Regions:
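Short coil turns that connect the paired helices of HEAT/ARM alpha-solenoid repeats
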Residues: 79-82, 112-117
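Residue-level signature of the C-terminal ends
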Residues: 93-97, 125, 129
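Conserved hydrophobic register position within alpha-solenoid helical repeats
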Residues: 90-93, 118-123
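Helix-boundary capping/turn motifs
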Residues: 82, 95-100
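Alpha-solenoid repeat scaffolds
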Residues: 100-101, 117, 132-133
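Buried hydrophobic core positions in alpha-solenoid tandem helical repeats
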Residues: 74-76, 104-108
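Extended repeat-based scaffolds of very large eukaryotic assembly and lipid-transport proteins
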Residues: 1-89, 129-131, 135-188
């Protein structure tokens, strides 16, 4: 689980994280991860992780015993939780720490989701940051970013258009344009 999501040099750290993760799933779901996978290119390799993970959250006391790299790995993994509150909790933790390049795909993937509060958290954390690293990642994954932008737009149209009728002011669009560096050249 999540083997292809992290660089090979993090194998030991990933194993340590797996040991503290519960085996119990939400509502005793018979699967721990979805079959749908997310793929991005990073550092000349394909990173792949499940769209959703159904494992229960861990206790904060367990989180506290992990080292910084292990915490970052755990935060990345739990951004794929089926529970939006859990995704937001670990996203906040991830954005509050200095994160490595390999964490960027997990942050970027959350930018096209339907939970407005998560999009607002990302925008508010990234808007005043130098996002050159994230923008470079997005520019190297243009096909995936075009799909993500379309998905974000679709969610705005379906769920948030009545609240924010001007798409130019919608936080999801501002996130993609201002923080992720998305522009029309991605579509060519």
């Amino acid at each position: 689980m999540f083997d292809a999501a992290f660089p090979n040099n993090l194998t030991e750290e990933l194993c340590a994280v797996r040991k503290v993760m519960p085996e119990r799933t939400f509502s005793d779901c018979p699967i721990t991860i979805s079959k749908d996978a997310i793929s991005y290119a990073l550092d000349n390799r394909i990173m792949e992780f499940p769209d959703r993970m159904y494992l229960m959250d861990i206790a904060d006391t367990t989180y506290d015993i992990l080292n910084q790299t292990q915490k970052q790995i755990l935060c990345c993994i739990y951004t794929r939780s089926c529970d939006g509150y859990v995704r937001e909790k670990y996203l906040r933790r991830l954005l509050d720490m200095p994160f490595d390049q390999w964490a960027i795909p997990f942050i970027v993937k959350l930018c096209d989701e339907y939970v407005l509060e998560i999009i607002e958290v990302i925008y508010n954390q990234l808007k005043d940051r130098d996002n050159t690293d994230i923008q470079s990642f997005c520019a190297n994954n243009k096909t995936a970013m075009v799909k993500s932008y379309a998905r974000m737009t679709s969610y705005w149209n379906e769920y948030y258009r009545k609240r924010e009728w001007d798409f130019g002011k919608y936080v999801g669009r501002r996130l993609f344009r201002e923080c992720l560096g998305y522009n029309r050249t991605f579509e060519k």
